[in-house]
Regions:
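Terminal presequence/propeptide segments associated with secretion/organelle targeting
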Residues: 8, 15-655
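Positively charged n-region of N-terminal signal peptides that target proteins for export
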Residues: 1-4
C-alpha cells in the first residue's frame, strides 16, 4: 500500500515545480501541467505532444544511440541534429584527401550521401508502466537470496515483453524516481544512416573551446543525415537498394523567429542528472573527482595539441579525441566554478537540515556523511587509476588485439594512432600513476618495472613500448581497489546509503507536496521555458540573440578557433544581420544536444547545442536565474544551406 500511495503522489507532484525547471516525462503530461504550459504560452493540447494512438510531435524526435537527439524534417527521412553530435561520424568518414571536418560535406544528390557505420536512430513507439512487475521480481529475488543486479531484473522483464512485441522493435526498461517507478519503452531502431550535410568546423564550431559553455556564441552547429529502410519500409542494415524512410511525423520549420519572452519547448533525450544527491556526494565531486579529471584532461590536451600543430595527419587522427577531452575538461572546471560560486554544498546541507527535522531521530544523514568520509581515500585512488591507466592513452584496443594474437585487428587499431603521441601520453600517465597511486595497488608488472628502473619514467617507457604495453595497462586492476573499498564499507555501502537518503528526500517532498520530477535517464523528456537574456555577473547584461556581424567581429586569421574560409567571410560581409544563436531558459543537460527547440505552435525554430558556464551546476543543482540553453537559430541553418552550400534541392525538400 505504501508503494501505491507513493506512486500516486509522485504523479501529483510532477506538476508542482517552477514553469521553467524540470525535465518532464513526455508520457505523463496531465491537465495540471498542460494548463501551466498553456499559461506560459503553449498553443497545443497535450495530445499533440505525445499520443500513442495518433501522430504527435514526439514521433518526430529521435535518439542518436542515446548520446544526442535529432529531429525528422522531411518525408524522405532527413534528420537534423548538432554537428558536434555527428563529429565522430564525420571524423570517421574523413581522410587526408577528403577532410570533411575541415572542408565540410554537402551531398548534392542522394547517391553522394555517405553511409555511416555504427550509428543507430531510435524512434519511441510506446512507453508503459511496469512498476508492479519489477517490484514483484525484486521481492522474488530477495526471497530466494538471488543476486539482485537490476540489469538482471530488467532483462527478465524485457525478455517477457519481447515476446509480446515480437518484431516490433527494441525494448528498454528504465528506473525513475530513484527506483520507485519503472517504465518500459518500445523503440523502432534504424541503422542505415547516411550523412547528407555538415558545415566545416570553422562554421559549426566557430569559437572552439574558447567560446564553449560561454555566451555570446556564433556557431552553425548542425548536421543532416538521411535514414534509409528496406524497400518495404522496415528497418534494415545498409544496402545499396534501400530507400529513404518515410517517417510518421516531421517537424514544420518556421522562419518567423522569436522575441524575448516567447514560449519555447525542447523535446529530447537528456542523459543523466543527480538533483536529489546529498551534500556529501556533491562534495566528493567537488574535492576529489573534478579537480583530478579537469587537470589530467587539460594536460593530455596540451600533449595532443602540440602534435596536432606539427602534423596535419595527426590533427585528423586525434581531432575526435581532442574534442572529447576538451568538452569533459571544460564541464569539470565549470562544475567546480558553479559549485563554489552558488554555494551548492551549503544549499544541499540546508536541504539536509530540513530532511533531518522531518525524519526526527533518524541517524541516516550522519551515517551517510561518515561513510563518505571513510571511503574518500580509496575513491581518490580509483580516480587516479582511471584517469591514468584507463583513460590516459588510446592504446587499449591495440594492446588487447596484440595480446590475443589478432594482428589484423591490431594493424587496424594502429592506423588510428600515432605512436609519438601515444608515447607522450603514456609518459604522462605513468608518471602521474606512480606519483599518486599507492604501491599496494600497482600489480606485479608495474611494481617490478618501477623497481628495475628506480622510478625513471623515461627508462620505464622504453621497456613498455618494447612489447609490454598490455602488461603496463593491465597490471593494476580495479578489483584490488574494489576489494579494499568493500573492506572499508563493512557491508553497508556508500551507494546504498545514498539511495536511502534519496528515498527519504522523495518521501519528504511528497508529504509536503513540494516540487519534484524524476532525474534524467536518457529517456524522452520535455522542458519548457522562454527566450531570455542573461545577466551572468554584476553590471553585465547579455542579449538573447547573436547575428552574423558577431562572427566577423570575432574573426582572427591567426587563431584556428576563430578563423574563417575566405569565401565564407566574403559572404558574411554581404549579410551581417542573419540570426545565428539565441538563448532560452529551458532545462537541459548532456544528451539534449541536437534537440529541437519549438515555438508555441510546435514549429522548429532552432536546435539546442550548449549551455552557459553559469548553468554547469545543473546536473546536481538547478540555479533558476542562471540556467540557459544555447540554440542555433534555424534561420542560420537555412541561410547556410541556401547561400553558402547552394543546396537548393535539399531546401525544397524540407520547406
Amino acid at each position: 500500500m505504501k508503494r501505491i500511495v507513493l506512486a500516486t503522489a509522485l504523479l501529483f507532484c510532477a506538476v508542482c515545480a517552477f514553469a521553467d525547471e524540470g525535465m518532464w516525462m513526455i508520457n505523463t503530461i496531465d491537465r495540471v501541467l498542460e494548463k501551466r504550459m498553456k499559461s506560459a504560452g503553449l498553443k497545443l493540447d497535450a495530445k499533440m505532444l505525445y499520443d500513442e494512438e495518433q501522430e504527435s510531435l514526439s514521433d518526430a524526435v529521435v535518439a542518436l544511440a542515446f548520446g544526442c537527439t535529432g529531429s525528422m524534417i522531411s518525408n524522405d527521412g532527413l534528420m537534423i541534429t548538432n554537428h558536434h553530435c555527428a563529429y565522430s561520424d564525420i571524423h570517421a568518414l574523413s581522410t587526408l584527401g577528403h577532410n570533411y571536418l575541415e572542408d565540410g560535406f554537402w551531398a548534392m544528390r542522394r547517391d553522394e550521401e555517405l553511409p555511416v557505420k555504427g550509428q543507430a536512430i531510435y524512434f519511441l513507439k510506446k512507453i508503459f508502466d511496469v512498476t508492479d512487475e519489477v517490484m514483484a521480481l525484486r521481492q522474488e529475488f530477495d526471497a530466494e537470496h538471488k543476486p539482485m543486479a537490476m540489469r538482471r531484473v530488467y532483462k527478465q522483464i524485457e525478455d517477457k515483453y519481447a515476446q509480446v512485441y515480437e518484431g516490433q522493435g527494441e525494448l528498454i526498461c528504465s528506473s525513475y524516481y530513484n527506483g520507485n517507478k519503472y517504465y518500459m519503452a518500445l523503440y523502432q531502431v534504424y541503422r542505415d544512416v547516411r550523412l547528407v550535410a555538415a558545415p566545416p568546423v570553422s562554421i559549426a564550431s566557430f569559437g572552439g573551446d574558447t567560446d564553449n559553455w560561454e555566451w555570446p556564441q556564433h556557431k552553425g552547429d548542425f548536421a543532416i543525415y538521411r535514414i534509409y529502410t528496406a524497400p518495404d519500409g522496415s528497418p534494415a542494415e545498409y544496402a545499396p537498394d534501400n530507400v529513404p524512410m518515410h517517417p510518421k511525423k516531421i517537424l514544420k520549420i518556421t522562419q518567423d523567429g522569436l522575441k524575448d519572452g516567447d514560449f519555447t519547448m525542447v523535446i529530447g533525450y537528456p542523459g543523466r542528472t543527480n538533483r536529489y544527491a546529498s551534500s556529501y556526494a556533491v562534495e566528493e565531486i567537488l574535492q576529489i573527482q573534478n579537480p583530478i579529471q579537469a587537470q589530467f584532461r587539460l594536460d593530455q590536451m596540451k600533449i595532443i595539441d602540440k602534435w596536432m600543430n606539427e602534423d596535419v595527419a595527426i590533427r585528423l587522427k586525434y581531432a575526435d579525441r581532442y574534442f572529447s577531452l576538451s568538452n569533459v575538461q571544460e564541464i569539470r572546471e565549470g562544475e567546480i566554478y558553479c559549485y563554489n560560486r552558488f554555494g551548492v554544498v551549503d544549499a544541499k546541507r540546508t536541504e539536509e537540515q530540513q530532511l533531518q527535522k522531518w525524519l526526527g531521530n533518524s541517524d541516516l544523514i550522519y551515517r551517510l556523511g561518515q561513510k563518505y568520509e571513510d571511503v574518500a581515500g580509496i575513491n581518490q585512488q580509483i580516480v587516479y587509476f582511471q584517469e591514468t591507466l584507463v583513460r590516459g592513452t588510446n592504446l587499449h584496443r591495440y594492446a588487447n588485439a596484440l595480446f590475443r594474437g589478432d594482428t589484423v585487428l591490431a594493424a587496424k587499431e594502429l592506423e588510428k594512432l600515432d605512436m609519438r603521441v601515444e608515447r607522450d601520453l603514456m609518459r604522462y600517465s605513468l608518471g602521474q600513476f606512480f606519483k599518486h597511486v599507492r604501491p599496494v595497488y600497482w600489480g606485479e608488472y608495474l611494481t617490478g618495472l618501477n623497481q628495475r628502473f628506480g622510478g625513471d619514467v623515461d627508462a620505464m617507457l622504453n621497456e613498455v613500448f618494447d612489447g609490454h604495453i598490455h602488461d603496463a595497462l593491465t597490471s593494476c586492476k580495479i578489483v584490488a581497489f574494489n576489494e579494499k573499498r568493500d573492506e572499508i564499507e563493512a557491508g553497508v555501502s556508500k551507494n546504498s546509503l545514498e539511495k536511502e537518503y534519496k528515498d527519504a528526500v522523495y518521501r519528504m517532498k511528497l508529504a509536503k507536496k513540494q516540487p519534484m520530477y524524476p532525474d534524467a535517464n536518457s529517456t524522452m523528456r520535455l522542458t519548457y521555458g522562454k527566450v531570455c537574456t542573461l545577466d551572468p555577473r554584476d553590471a553585465v547584461s547579455l542579449a538573447s540573440r547573436t547575428r552574423t556581424a558577431g562572427v566577423l567581429e570575432k574573426y582572427n586569421a591567426d587563431d584556428y578557433e576563430f578563423t574563417l574560409k575566405p569565401d565564407f567571410r566574403e559572404l558574411l560581409l554581404q549579410h551581417p544581420d542573419i540570426p545565428v544563436n539565441f538563448l532560452t531558459d529551458n532545462d537541459i543537460t548532456g544528451g539534449n544536444s541536437g534537440s529541437p527547440v519549438l515555438n508555441a505552435k510546435g514549429e522548429l525554430v532552432g536546435l539546442a547545442f550548449d549551455g552557459n558556464k553559469e548553468s554547469l551546476a545543473g546536473d546536481t543543482y538547478f540555479v533558476e536565474s542562471m540556467n540557459r540553453c544555447i540554440c542555433v537559430d534555424i534561420r542560420y541553418v537555412l541561410w547556410l544551406l541556401r547561400d553558402y552550400a547552394h543546396m537548393d534541392e535539399l531546401l525544397t525538400e524540407i520547406l
